[in-house]
Amino acid sequence: MPFFSYRATEAYLTGNKAAAKAFSLGAHRLNARVQELHRQAGQRIFDSRNTTIHPSTNSSNDHMVDLHGLHPTEAVEMLETTVGKLKRTGFKGRMVVVTGTGHHSRGQKAKVLPAIREYLHRVGLRAQEGTMSDGRGGMFTIQI
């Protein structure tokens, strides 16, 4: 993308507006493709960690969703989609949302956890923060 953007700027500054437009459109197309590939990768990661969204196959009234490995925006989108699917199926119960604590993130700082906390607050889902068996935190429990 920087190549196309650089070339678009260069062409514009030299007065070649047609080339500038072509390079700019190329940059936009490439950016859209990159975004789509990121979305697909996030979906694959989510699907590999969450094999079912059908609470009826779960004998208890609990449902777990694991958001490890996702970027914060992807994690919020996946949680929003999952909550919507569960509500549409009439699910009533406890949902455990695993975010992790950032131990595998750059700087060892949680990124998904605060994004999910903010999302839950914004949409009015009351959540209780908890911890997994390792005692590190990185989990929310919400009632649906």
Predicted ranges, named:
Residues M1-I144:
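Long, charged, low-complexity intrinsically disordered regions
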